[in-house]
């Protein structure tokens, strides 16, 4: 019956069940053509098929007015869409040219395009009707070739199984998958396929090889991720609830005689627009409802296409490229290494726009088009499968990819105009795969210890709240600043007892603020301020670093989301969780009553200690020592500071600096003196005023001002540098880091003196902090590249905490990796690509351990002296032979989050 229905489209019968068909069906019933075991079940569906045949006959009558070419073409599609009577799930597909005669075969091959699709190959046990249909199809194909109709695209739609219930369920699943493919494979003529989508699942072997070759020779690739509802990365909502469905790639073909320009995309044929036959391919990465063998074949070819995309030498353009790379890594799964994406360079217009205007950190695609493109260009990003047809959605995606290409080229031209192209290409673009790899690797967390710590902190918070109510003489909401202000100053009058002339106020409040600086100034006058300070500290640890981490945990581990464009200084930022905000300094609390253990015993809690390395691995931390002070020394060129760093490296730079500043022997420098010097230095670096420094030091404002003046008088070149930075900002409206990063500061010309002073502080701060951020990013890139190039190292970069890089390393690789990391990072004082030559050496301190909160310093014997960066194995240049420290991993530290 299914054979009969399939052959209706070949005009063997235009009315259901003719006399000829009845005879054939009788022969089939006898068992010569059809298995008798399945005949009974097949006859049960006769009535349904008869209705389908009648309906199809009516459709044929309606089409008589159409041209002969369209009639023959659609008849052929109808035949192939209905399938064969007996098609094994293991049958494979062949090109349409396999059905052509020998004298027509060569001509048809030349007419095939990548958008050509597949037809099912017939089983060798096919019925007589199938053979007749095959001859009829051969006759039709000769007519089509004679009329120069080009390639014809067909698809498999029905598959027959012996068991009727199994056939029904599998056929429904396949029809659903085929219907989805129709949205991507426009069912019109082959020209329409070229203009819209080509699903790579429907390509034959010849077309697949042509696709790979086309990707290798492409002038540019424009990519976006598509979600199950039809939306893409180009939509306003960048975090859709729906899952990823596939990846769309618009391929810009190489112009005749043209050459790609991966290092300078704004040149040559790359600037030329797309032509009508530039293909748009669809790569499905969502699991499809077809049998495993074919699904695996589709996925394997999809991996090959994506792998070629990762290695492509032409410009690859993608909005939010980091998310695309992470999705590709997830699709590769266990079959792919993170090193497969290490060389990927994608042009991300959001990053380009952020370099031009750092204050606009998270613009949408539509925002960027409106801001940087011509007014006539419109963006269609709101169409989804829920409110538009698939063809409309797919057409919109193609048009938006063209707009994305044009936007990116315009932004690249602007980067060159602003002198930012080298920074974009050398520093920001290589970070994209690094951040994607970091997000794809989770860090293990000791969940049991974290839950225990949460309960302990919760009990301590309740005790502190009760103590606060007792010493205040009444109950109040301890987290309410207004109620606390009324208790401290309205009831207790502590501001009148303070020796300080004035305490900072908030807005127009009649009482001082309840900030940390004010509470520290009042802590010796009454027990309440001290209780409030401890309560806030414990509450922050519990809510942010314990309960917050528990909320982000999945399967006993966490993975932060890294934002490359989240700050104006160029620093990276993290969220869900903010791993950069987890303090390295432990806190001490008193054991709560009714808690296991001795009462009134001091516990030390380290939030970082809850992060533990995976089995067989160790954390390795590499920290730039005094990076911002070294940058300040380089920028200012102060002779005293240069002498401090250019001489033999000292054990404690800040102690030596204190000795220089206060003119006392190093042996007499106390810990308090050292900390005071450190805070003064960073007050200068960050542009903090005397008020903020006074709050940090816990001294009167006048004394803090004297510290600043004395320090700047000792190191006069620092003051000269600050004046030069401010003058440059007044002249150009922006400031620039040592690697060319710029920050516009329009308030530098404000009439309001307070706003203008703030902009001046930001100018000095940005030059130092932005330069340090650039150097840390450069360290990430060089170490990542060196590890990726190594045949032995497998270390994973798991976090960047500003001037610290955290790796997870296999235990036997710790010595080799530590040596490579130190040598690579310390060699960055000279970077030829950015024409950078620091006047001071860089120093990196290394530490390792099983827990992030309990890292121990690595002995100097583990690493060789600083030298030029190399990518080969450094195992021969470690410590002297026989040194036990050079052959053994650091001590194992499975320490709990609090040490008794």
UniProtKB/Swiss-Prot annotation:
Reactions listed under catalytic activity: DNA(n) + a 2'-deoxyribonucleoside 5'-triphosphate = DNA(n+1) + diphosphate
Compositionally biased region (Polar residues): 76-90
UniProt similarity note: Belongs to the DNA polymerase type-A family.
Top-level division of the source organism's lineage: Eukaryota
Keyword line: DNA damage, DNA repair, DNA replication, DNA-binding, DNA-directed DNA polymerase, Nucleotidyltransferase, Nucleus, Transferase
Subcellular locations according to the entry: Nucleus
Spans annotated as Disordered: 60-90, 863-900
Subunit structure comment from the entry: Interacts with FANCD2, FANCI, PCNA, RAD51 and HELQ.
Gene source species: Homo sapiens
Entry's Gene Ontology molecular function annotations: cyclin binding; DNA binding; DNA-directed DNA polymerase activity
The protein's Enzyme Commission number: 2.7.7.7
Function: DNA polymerase with very low fidelity that catalyzes considerable misincorporation by inserting dTTP opposite a G template, and dGTP opposite a T template. Is the least accurate of the DNA polymerase A family (i.e. POLG, POLN and POLQ). Can perform accurate translesion DNA synthesis (TLS) past a 5S-thymine glycol. Can perform efficient strand displacement past a nick or a gap and gives rise to an amount of product similar to that on non-damaged template. Has no exonuclease activity. Error-prone DNA polymerase that preferentially misincorporates dT regardless of template sequence.
Record-level GO cellular component terms: nucleoplasm; nucleus
CDD domains (alphabetical): DNA_pol_A_theta
Chief localization: nucleus
Pfam families linked: DNA_pol_A, DNA_pol_P_Exo
Tissue expression per record: Highly expressed in testis and heart. Weakly expressed in skeletal muscle.
Notes on how activity is controlled: Inhibited by ddTTP.
Effect noted on mutating residue 623 to A: Abolishes catalytic activity
GO biological process: DNA-templated DNA replication; double-strand break repair; double-strand break repair via homologous recombination; interstrand cross-link repair; translesion synthesis
Protein name: DNA polymerase nu
Compositional bias (Basic and acidic residues): 60-75
pH dependence, entry free text: Optimum pH is 8.8.
